[in-house]
């Protein structure tokens, strides 16, 4: 057994950690579809799913079975290869982006010094998946939806990145673990970077194409947008991917602005995973509450809001942060 070296054991443990974390993320994304329907029913004074199992608890299993057995149909005039690759690229980009999010002091898939840059690289890759889906479907509604989605994502990613430059200026690092530890030694960034938090949260909702920024999938205008031609497991990958995106943005908000796995004032540090999960769940509920309470604006209003309101606010935050950093030196 001389081939079993400490390096090999370390590699195997790292791979197992990555598999466990990514499986938890996928399961959470799938469960969110049921949780959202139940919460929307509660807030809108109706029952929600309540037919399969007690209190509708087995509805998710029924939906998964239905998805598995639906016909995996491809439009006759579609580009079959690109049409198939689009949901795979979308799901892969989301899971790879989650790799740089530290869950606890010891649990995380990858501890990269360029963690923030890696996240934005994967977020940019997801834009290609949306364009692939719309163009390869050979459907005008799908193409319009993909063009809307790509323009919206690229626009909001601009100040999404700028919103985090204030954090980078204060910590001097793109590493997410360094950012979390900096907050433990000083204060959570929600206080000194409040403007950055607001713009990052707005951009996160827009990048995940969630209500009220779901114009790329507007049923009344585009009949579900770029996944109109998808069915079966391909559609399921887009569907679950949307909820994984919610988990990802919520986890990033916790990591970058709310101390990551640390509790308030350093309370009960041994419950690091519980603190991280509770804070992430709060932002997930906030995503669902936005869907239940806000109307959908016009697409031109969404784009004007990004460039005329959010971008100047982000630049103001960056200017103020730079002034404080220079004054502190």
UniProtKB/Swiss-Prot annotation:
Membrane topology designation: Multi-pass membrane protein
Catalytic activity, as annotated: a quinone + NADH + 5 H(+)(in) = a quinol + NAD(+) + 4 H(+)(out)
Disulphide linkage map: none
Record gene name: nuoH
PANTHER family: NADH DEHYDROGENASE SUBUNIT 1, NADH-UBIQUINONE OXIDOREDUCTASE CHAIN 1
Known function: NDH-1 shuttles electrons from NADH, via FMN and iron-sulfur (Fe-S) centers, to quinones in the respiratory chain. The immediate electron acceptor for the enzyme in this species is believed to be ubiquinone. Couples the redox reaction to proton translocation (for every two electrons transferred, four hydrogen ions are translocated across the cytoplasmic membrane), and thus conserves the redox energy in a proton gradient. This subunit may bind ubiquinone.
Membrane-crossing segments per the record: 11-31, 81-101, 114-134, 154-174, 187-207, 238-258, 270-290, 309-329
Family matches, as InterPro entries: NADH_UbQ_OxRdtase_su1/FPO, NADH_UbQ_OxRdtase_su1_CS
Subunit structure: NDH-1 is composed of 13 different subunits. Subunits NuoA, H, J, K, L, M, N constitute the membrane sector of the complex.
UniProt GO BP: aerobic respiration
Name the UniProt record assigns to this protein: NADH-quinone oxidoreductase subunit H
Keywords linked to the UniProt accession: Cell inner membrane, Cell membrane, Membrane, NAD, Quinone, Translocase, Transmembrane, Transmembrane helix, Ubiquinone
GO cellular component assignments: plasma membrane
Claim: Cell cycle is one of the keywords in the record: no
Record-listed E.C. numbers: 7.1.1.-
Entries under Pfam families matching the protein: NADHdh
Subcellular location(s) of the protein: Cell inner membrane
Family according to the record: Belongs to the complex I subunit 1 family.
GO MF entries: NADH dehydrogenase activity; oxidoreductase activity, acting on NAD(P)H, quinone or similar compound as acceptor; quinone binding
